């Protein structure tokens, strides 16, 4: 027996194949944590349960922040929205950022030197501040504080029976760590940070 979106489908004896419907981003196998592409046929060998993935989108936040923890740098943030949170929280869907400098992007888009930052769980937590679907990616150890960086976020559906499909956000950033630091100072936000962070902000701003 198959259960798709809480509706049971009986597969008759000797007819052990099942063809998925037309959900936009496939069907998540709840028991095995994998995703099947829509319209494909599987062999049913046991009771199986699937949930459809009808919506999936990704948006990168236009503003850029400063990363203070561990190695400091510029931090980008993105949000994934979907109607299937169980699939989103599985390893079958992966996400991250592509980051490069503004000058490289202007000349080669993301075909030149690109830093790929995968979103990896830390301490068992996949999402930034425990906000489901939100994650960050950073470029650290920046030498030239005035050099501008750009980024785009991506989310990939890793189908078990087909090529992976990747969605990408618009390009955001066009900011330097010096520019972000000076914005914090000029707008009176520096008082919101502790002494260690304030010292870094002043350093990046060239104060």
Locations of regions flagged by a protein language model:
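Secondary-structure capping and domain/repeat boundary segments
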Residues: 1-56
């Amino acid at each position: 027996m198959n259960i798709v979106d809480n509706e049971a489908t009986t597969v008759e004896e000797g007819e052990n194949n099942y063809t998925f419907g037309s959900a936009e981003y496939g069907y998540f196998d709840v028991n095995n944590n994998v995703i099947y592409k829509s319209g494909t046929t599987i062999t049913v060998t046991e009771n199986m349960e699937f949930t459809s993935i009808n919506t999936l989108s990704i948006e990168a936040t236009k503003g850029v922040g400063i990363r203070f923890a561990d190695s400091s740098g510029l931090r980008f943030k993105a949000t994934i929205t979907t109607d299937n949170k169980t699939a989103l929280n599985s390893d079958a869907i992966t996400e991250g950022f592509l980051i490069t400098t503004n000058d490289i992007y202007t000349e080669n888009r993301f075909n030149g030197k690109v830093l790929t930052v995968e979103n990896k769980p830390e301490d068992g937590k996949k999402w930034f501040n425990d906000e489901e679907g939100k994650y960050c990616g950073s470029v650290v150890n920046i030498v030239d504080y005035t050099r501008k960086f750009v980024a785009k976020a991506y989310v990939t559906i890793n189908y078990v029976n087909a090529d992976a499909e990747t969605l990408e956000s618009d390009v955001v950033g066009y900011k330097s760590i010096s520019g972000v630091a000076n914005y914090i100072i000029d707008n009176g936000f520096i008082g919101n940070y502790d002494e260690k962070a304030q010292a870094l902000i002043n350093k990046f701003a060239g104060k």
